[in-house]
Regions:
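Short, extreme N-terminal segment that most often corresponds to the first beta-strand
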Residues: 1-30
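Intrinsic-disorder/low-complexity signal
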Residues: 20-55
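Low-complexity intrinsically disordered segments
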Residues: 41-172, 176
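Single conserved hydrophobic/aromatic residue that forms the stacking wall/gate
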Residues: 173-185
Length: 185
C-alpha cells in the first residue's frame, strides 16, 4: 500500500495545478526529492506536465532505448502513469486549497505545494487549517511531521476524558508476542 500525496504548483492565490503520486509520499522521501531536485519553477512545471505519478524520483526522463515502467523501472527515474504505463486521464488538474485539503476516497496523506516564492511547503492532508510547514527547513532541522500536526495542538484543546480515552484505547490491545499486536474487543 502506498503513501499517497498531491504535488501542486501554485498558479493563483487559491489555485494549484495538481498531480497525484501513489507511492512514497512521506516528507523524507517525496518531500526530500522535491526540495532537492525540483527547486526551480521550470523543473516543477516539467514534473507537473507528466501528470499523475506512480512514483517520484530525482530524474524526469528515462533512457528511451530501455524499458521503463513500474515492473522495470530505470534507476532514479520518475514513473508517470500516462507516459510509462499508457494510462489515460492522468493530466494535472486545477484544485483549490479546500480540495487539496480533502483526502477523498483515494486517501491522500500529504500535500506538497511549490509556492510563488519558489519553496516547497507541505501539510498532512486534512490539516491545512493548522498551517503549512517548509519542507527544506523541516528536513534540515530534523523536524519533519510524519504523521499529523495534531500532536502539536492537542495539549491546547479541551478534550473531555482525554486520559480515559487513552486507557480505553489501550485496553483493546493485547500483546501476544513482542513483535505482534492483536486487537480484541
Amino acid at each position: 500500500m502506498g503513501t499517497r500525496s498531491y504535488i501542486a504548483l501554485q498558479i493563483e492565490e487559491d489555485e494549484y495545478l495538481t498531480i497525484f503520486c501513489h507511492y512514497n509520499g512521506y516528507p523524507d522521501d517525496n518531500g526530500a526529492i522535491l526540495a532537492e531536485h525540483y527547486d526551480k519553477q521550470e523543473k516543477v512545471e516539467s514534473l507537473i506536465q507528466l501528470g499523475d505519478l506512480y512514483f517520484l524520483r530525482s530524474k524526469l526522463e528515462p533512457n528511451p532505448d530501455l524499458p521503463h515502467n513500474h515492473s522495470t523501472p530505470q534507476p532514479n527515474v520518475t514513473i508517470a502513469y500516462n507516459r510509462d504505463e499508457g494510462w489515460s486521464d492522468c493530466e494535472a488538474v486545477h484544485k483549490t486549497l479546500d480540495e487539496l485539503n480533502d483526502p477523498g476516497e483515494i486517501g491522500i496523506e500529504f500535500t506538497y505545494i511549490f509556492t510563488f516564492e519558489g519553496r516547497w511547503i507541505y501539510f498532512p492532508t486534512g490539516e491545512a487549517e493548522l498551517g503549512f510547514r517548509d519542507v527544506k527547513e523541516d528536513l534540515d532541522n530534523d523536524t519533519v511531521q510524519y504523521d499529523s500536526f495534531f500532536t502539536e495542538h492537542e495539549n491546547n484543546m479541551d478534550w473531555p476524558d482525554n486520559g480515559d480515552f487513552a486507557l480505553d484505547t489501550l485496553s483493546l490491545i493485547h500483546i501476544s508476542e513482542p513483535t505482534r499486536l492483536r486487537c480484541i474487543s
